[in-house]
C-alpha cells in the first residue's frame, strides 16, 4: 500500500507548537492549497488542509515559518478518532508531515508582508523575520542578456565519434 502526500501551499496561521508529556515537540497548522481548476465564476478555490509535524521538524517549522509562508510538505494521510464530551465518535483526517521546505526567500516573505500591510490587506502579515540590513537590492539578478555560450567555438563531431 502507498500513502504518500506532496503539498505546496501557504500557511493560514502560525504553527502551534506544543510538547507531549514525554517532551516530544508537535506542531499543528493549516495549509491553503490552490486547486488546479477554476469554479463556475472563474475563481480558483483552495483546500485548507490540517497538518501535524513532529520532533525537531516541528521546532524548526515553528521558528522559521510564519503565517503566509509558502511551504512544500511531504508526508502521509492519517485518520484518527476520539469520543467527544457528548459521547459521539469524531473522526479527524490530517496530513502527518515527514518533511517541509520553505519555498521562497526571506526577502520575498518580508516583501509580501510589507506590501500586504501597506495595502491594508493583512492576509499574510505578522512575519517575525528580522531583516538586519538586508535589502532587495542585494538579491542577485539571474536574468541574462547574452547567451552563456556566446564566446565558445562550435564543436566538430562526426558520425564516427558517436557511440550509436
UniProtKB/Swiss-Prot annotation:
InterPro entries for the chain: NA-bd_OB-fold, Primosome_PriB/ssb, ssDNA-bd
Region: Disordered, residue numbers: 111-164
SS bond partners: none
SSB domain segment(s): 1-104
Pfam families named in the record: SSB
UniProt entry keywords in alphabetical sequence: DNA damage, DNA recombination, DNA repair, DNA replication, DNA-binding
Low complexity bias locations: 111-138
SUPFAM superfamilies per the UniProt record, alphabetical: Nucleic acid-binding proteins
Residues spanned by motif Important for interaction with partner proteins: 159-164
UniProt GO cellular component terms: nucleoid
GO MF terms, alphabetically ordered: single-stranded DNA binding
GO BP terms in the entry: DNA recombination; DNA repair; DNA replication
PANTHER family, per the entry: SINGLE-STRANDED DNA-BINDING PROTEIN
Protein function: Plays an important role in DNA replication, recombination and repair. Binds to ssDNA and to an array of partner proteins to recruit them to their sites of action during DNA metabolism.
Quaternary organization: Homotetramer.
Name of the protein described by the UniProt record: Single-stranded DNA-binding protein
Lineage: Bacteria, Bacillati, Bacillota, Bacilli, Lactobacillales
Name of the gene: ssb
Amino acid at each position: 500500500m502507498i500513502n504518500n502526500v506532496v503539498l505546496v501551499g501557504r500557511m493560514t496561521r502560525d504553527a502551534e507548537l506544543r510538547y507531549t508529556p514525554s517532551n516530544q515537540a508537535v506542531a499543528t497548522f493549516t495549509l491553503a492549497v490552490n486547486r488546479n481548476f477554476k469554479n463556475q465564476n472563474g475563481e480558483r478555490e483552495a483546500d485548507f488542509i490540517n497538518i501535524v509535524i513532529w520532533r525537531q521538524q516541528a521546532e524548526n517549522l515553528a521558528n522559521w515559518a510564519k503565517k503566509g509562508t509558502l511551504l512544500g510538505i511531504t508526508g502521509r494521510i492519517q485518520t484518527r478518532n476520539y469520543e467527544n464530551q457528548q459521547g459521539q465518535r469524531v473522526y479527524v483526517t490530517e496530513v502527518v508531515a515527514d518533511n517541509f521546505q520553505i519555498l521562497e526567500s526571506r526577502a520575498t516573505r518580508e516583501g509580501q508582508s510589507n506590501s500586504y500591510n501597506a495595502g491594508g490587506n493583512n492576509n499574510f502579515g505578522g512575519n517575525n523575520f528580522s531583516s538586519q540590513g538586508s535589502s532587495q537590492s542585494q538579491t542577485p539578478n539571474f536574468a541574462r542578456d547574452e547567451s552563456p555560450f556566446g564566446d565558445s567555438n562550435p564543436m566538430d563531431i562526426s558520425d564516427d565519434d558517436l557511440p550509436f
